[in-house]
Amino acid sequence: MLLEETLKSCPIVKRGKYHYFIHPISDGVPLVEPKLLREVATRIIKIGNFEGVNKIVTAEAMGIPLVTTLSLYTDIPYVIMRKREYKLPGEVPVFQSTGYSKGQLYLNGIEKGDKVIIIDDVISTGGTMIAIINALERAGAEIKDIICVIERGDGKKIVEEKTGYKIKTLVKIDVVDGEVVIL
C-alpha cells in the first residue's frame, strides 16, 4: 500500500534527541500526491463508523487535507480546531500539550448533540487528541469514532486509558536507526 511504502522511504530529521519522520500526510512535504490522499481516505471510510455522523472534526494543520478529502467523499461537513481564537459564540478553548509544543486550541461550529468522528494525521504523545476530546465533550458532542492515520509511540494507549475512547489507526510505526519501521 502506498501509505506504508511512502513511510518507509520518508526522510528523518533529528531535533535534539527526537527523530521526526517527514511525510506528506504528517507534514505536507515533500509533495502530497492525490493518490495517497485517496488511498488514506478510502481506508478511513472502510474502518470508520460514519453512521449518523453530521460533522468530521480535526485539529489544524495536517488534518485539514484529510478531512477535506473525507468530506468530499462522504458529503459530511468538517470542523477544524484552530490554534487562534475567533471569539465566536460557543467557542470552546482547550489547552493542548504535545511532545513538542503547548498552547490553546479553539473549537467552533459544534453544537450540543452533534455526532462527530475525529480524524487526525498522527498520534504520538496523545496530547492533541486529549484536547480535541475534552473540547468536544464540553461542547456536548457525541464522539462516534476516532481515527488517526499514523500511530507512533504510546499516545494511543494513553488516550484510550485517560478517556475510555478506542482509537483506530491505519499504520503503526517507529523510527529505528534513522529509518521508519512499520510495526
From Swiss-Prot:
Keyword line: Cytoplasm, Glycosyltransferase, Purine salvage, Transferase
Coiled coil regions in record: none
GO biological process, one term: purine ribonucleoside salvage
InterPro entries xrefs: HGPRTase-like, PRibTrfase_dom, PRTase-like, Pur/Pyrimidine_PRTase
UniProt GO cellular component terms: cytoplasm
A molecular function (GO) term: hypoxanthine phosphoribosyltransferase activity
Enzyme class: transferase
Top-level division of the source organism's lineage: Archaea
Family of the protein in this entry: Belongs to the purine/pyrimidine phosphoribosyltransferase family. Archaeal HPRT subfamily.
Subunit field text: Homodimer.
Protein name: Hypoxanthine/guanine phosphoribosyltransferase
Annotated source species: Methanocaldococcus vulcanius (strain ATCC 700851 / DSM 12094 / M7) (Methanococcus vulcanius)
